[in-house]
Structures are given as C-alpha cells and as structure tokens.
C-alpha cells in the first residue's frame, strides 16, 4: 500500500499536534507592558482570550485548509508586585492560565479536545533604565511543567516540559502623546519525553526568537484612553520527535490593534485584536481577541 506525501504529512502532524496550540511561541507583550508602576504598587490582571483558526501549514509544505480548524479559549490570572531593589525597579509576578481547546480537525481528521490548567509562568522584570520618557528592561520567564497533560493526546493545555524565555525591551516617548515599545526575546525549550505516550516519543524543539513593535497614542486632552498598533515576527522553533521533524515550527508574522481605557484611576479595561498574516509550521490564527481587566492597588 502506498500513501501520498500530503496524507503522510497530515498523519505525522496530527499525531503530535498538542504542541502547536500551546504557548510554544515567545512571550507576547501588550503595548505598554514595559512601563513600570511606582515601587510599592500591586496589580491584579485577568485575561480572557478567544482564538479561531481554519488552516494549517506544515514547515516547507502546502497550506491544509479543507477540513481544518481549531478554536481555543484561555483565561489567565496574573499578580504583580512592583518593588525597589538596590535602586532598580523589579516586578516579581506569577501567571496562572486555564484553557480549553475544541473544534479541532486537520485535513478532515478529528483532533482530541482538551481543557485544564496551563503551565504556570514565573517572571520578574528588572528595569535597568527607568527615566521619564525612557525605559529599558530585562525580563526572564520560567514556565513550570505543572499544567494538565495527557501523554499521547493530539491536544493538550500543558506542555510537560520546562521552558525559559529571556526578553529585552523598552519604551521611548516620542512627543504629542505618541510612545513606541520595542522588544526581542529568545525562548529555550526542555525536552518532552512523553510526546506520543507515557515514556515514549522524545520531543525536542529549536529555540524560538521573536521581535515585537508597538506604536501607541494617548490623547493629550484625555489620557485615560490609549490606542495602539503593533507587529510581531517569530522564527525558529522547529520540532523533532525521536529525531524526525514533525512539520511544526514557530514561524509567523502577526498584526495587532489594541484599545485601552482607565475607567477609574486604578481600573483599566483593554481590548486586543490579533491576526496572523503568515504562518509556516502551525495553525494560522484568523482571529485572536483578548479582553484584559487590570486593578492597581
């Protein structure tokens, strides 16, 4: 019996697809995340994200669109404390995600659904420069493999591996209410030794790299509003299972639009729209929406 190349590639990808829908990319930033609050401030944030996808492109292959799709809903609770350490502003924080993956299919093949806790994220940005109008920060992120993971399933919320992301970025005021934020990061992956079953299938992944740029405008006449436009590019992240490439990577270009409003001096509501314009090695997000609510203390 012979199997076509396209069918073979779909089968291989479907067997290991759990990773493509998890946060395997580097860390996304909102438009003013690198502007710190004063030392002594606490912040609680809640994120609610919905995304829909209707095509998948394996690395170096053709787009698979017919019978392909995946929806997800993810909520994240985040706690941040800003403090002064030896003259530098530091913000230790923890992020706790909970997600659901559903309506998954690839080339007509149904994918498992999944729900549960995601991998907790620990981070502590350090602002090396924190001047009026200019900031520059070093931001490490540690992903702890404590999320929901069922070995061998095509979709999982947790990743069953350690990850470490190192990010550099800063903000520069441009005048007349305009601000730009630029950042770059590199993400290192540990191995998942249970990728295809308990104790079977060793998944390895190359480093992922990402650039993000934002331009924001806050009306001088009403500084409770901010509108922002952004772009992100990711590359690298090619995956192998037991030494064989599985058609997945983290190569993408994405555009973003964000609107935020302080409804009180300590409560901000923010909406974010994202859309992939190019993907090689994964699902293409047609629509990615996020509602963020932040409370400062």
Predicted regions and their residues:
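Outer-membrane beta-barrel biogenesis signature
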Residues: 23-45, 53-55
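Residues that define the transmembrane beta-barrel architecture of outer-membrane proteins
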Residues: 40, 69-75, 88, 111-120, ...
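Residue-level signature of outer-membrane beta-barrel architecture
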Residues: 48, 81-83, 126-128, 168, ...
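Transmembrane beta-strands of outer-membrane beta-barrel pores
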Residues: 48-54, 96-102, 128, 142-148, ...
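Surface-exposed strand-loop-strand hairpins of Gram-negative outer-membrane beta-barrel proteins
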Residues: 51-74, 109-113, 155
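Repeated loop/turn-to-beta-strand initiation elements of outer-membrane beta-barrel proteins
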Residues: 54-55, 87-90, 132-135, 177-180, ...
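Outer membrane beta-barrel transmembrane domains
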Residues: 57, 63-65, 199-297
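Outer-membrane pore/translocation modules
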Residues: 99-204, 248
């Amino acid at each position: 019996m012979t199997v076509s190349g396209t069918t073979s590639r779909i089968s291989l990808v479907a067997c290991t697809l759990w990773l493509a829908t998890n946060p395997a990319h580097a860390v996304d930033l909102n438009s003013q995340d690198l502007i710190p609050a004063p030392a002594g401030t606490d912040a609680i944030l809640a994120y609610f994200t919905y995304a829909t996808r209707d095509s998948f492109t394996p690395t170096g292959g053709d787009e698979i669109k017919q019978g392909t799709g995946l929806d997800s809903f993810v909520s994240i609770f985040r706690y941040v404390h800003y403090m002064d350490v030896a003259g530098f502003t530091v913000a230790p924080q923890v992020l706790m995600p909970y997600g659901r993956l559903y309506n998954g299919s690839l080339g007509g093949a149904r994918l498992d659904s999944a729900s549960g806790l995601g991998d907790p994220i620990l981070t502590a940005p350090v602002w090396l420069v924190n001047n009026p109008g200019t900031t520059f920060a070093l931001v490490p992120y540690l992903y702890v493999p404590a999320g929901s993971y069922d070995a061998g399933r095509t979709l999982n919320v947790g990743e069953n591996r350690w990850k470490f992301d190192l990010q550099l970025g800063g903000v520069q005021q441009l005048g007349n209410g305009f601000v730009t934020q630029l950042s770059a990061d590199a993400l290192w992956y540990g191995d998942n030794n249970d990728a295809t079953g308990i104790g079977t299938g060793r998944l390895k992944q190359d480093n992922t790299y990402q650039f993000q740029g934002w331009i924001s405008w806050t009306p001088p006449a009403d500084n409770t509003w901010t509108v922002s436009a952004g772009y992100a590019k990711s590359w690298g992240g090619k995956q192998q299972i037991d030494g064989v490439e599985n058609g997945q990577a983290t190569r993408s270009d994405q555009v973003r639009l964000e609107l935020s409003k302080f409804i009180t001096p300590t409560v901000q509501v923010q909406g974010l729209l994202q859309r992939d314009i190019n993907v090689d090695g994964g699902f293409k997000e047609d629509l990615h929406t996020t509602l963020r609510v932040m409370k400062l203390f």
